[in-house]
Design a protein with these regions (language model features):
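Flavin-dependent oxidoreductase catalytic cores
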Residues: 2-258
Length: 258
């Protein structure tokens, strides 16, 4: 689970609830540049206050046994990408955080929207690579601008891991490439149809417990990418709650996926 905030006590209490709810890791968001988040004085703006971030990490680690990580940028605004980023990582890692997921862009807190902040600031992968050289005992995971699973291979020569976001969400089927490309395991023979059929019991369980079925199925829409009936499939998933027999409709959709 990812938490956002700047109050060490409240974050510690939130971590307790998260652990009790079954989450296996706490990630602290120090990367979001949205105006709302800035006004709450958390997210990316906290990169300017590494001491407070360190206090938050200490509080969380004192309250839970599950791992704690930080997601951040390489800097914000006029921060020095070399000196200031190193100082931030040093301060926060000394408080007990050993895993950092680093979006290889600065965040500009004024003048750019959150969407623009995901694309306009230039990527600086080399800076993230150097972080791993500076802090070899930390786990450094690179993020930002990664469009294909194949992109991961070159980064993994320099860092410990890769995080992909929007591109995997929009086309989740490409995750089947991870095992053969990264781990040298046999390629999965699962089709998109197989995957959706496997998800039907979960969807119906959520539906029976009162969840809005269309919100659950919203996250399957990426399976339609590149298929012949993509528009039809996405429309059916969005309207699944209007069908009398949603389970039967899901089977029909799965058959359209092929």
């Amino acid at each position: 689970i990812q938490l956002g905030g700047n109050d060490p006590i409240k974050l510690g209490d939130s971590a307790i609830i998260s652990e009790a709810s079954g989450y296996d890791e706490i990630n602290l968001n120090i990367g979001c540049p949205s105006p709302k988040v800035q006004n709450g004085e958390f997210g990316a703006v906290l990169m300017k206050n590494p001491k407070l971030v360190a206090q938050c990490i200490k509080s969380i680690k004192n309250k839970v046994k599950i791992p704690v990580s930080v997601k951040c940028r390489i800097g914000v605004d006029d921060m020095n990408e070399d000196k200031d980023l190193s100082a931030f990582i040093k301060e926060v890692s000394d408080s007990g955080c050993k895993v950092f997921i680093v979006h290889a862009r600065k965040a500009w807190l004024k003048g750019l929207s959150p969407k623009e902040n995901r694309n306009i600031p230039p990527l600086n992968y080399q800076r993230v690579y150097r972080l791993k050289e500076e802090f070899p005992d930390l786990e450094i995971i690179i993020n930002g601008g990664l469009e294909k699973i194949e992109d991961s291979e070159k980064h993994l020569r320099f860092v410990d891991g890769v995080m992909m976001g929007r591109n995997v969400y929009e086309d989740p089927y490409q995750l089947l490439k991870v095992d053969p490309l990264i781990y040298g395991l046999p390629e999965s023979l699962k089709t998109k149809r197989d995957i959706l059929l496997e998800m039907i019991p979960y969807v119906m369980q959520q539906n029976n417990s009162g969840e809005k079925i269309q919100l659950v199925c919203k996250h399957f829409m990426g399976l339609a990418k590149g298929t012949k009936f993509a528009k039809n499939i996405r429309s059916s998933l969005a309207r699944l709650h209007t069908f009398k027999r949603p389970e039967k409709k899901l089977i029909q959709i799965a058959n359209q996926l092929g």
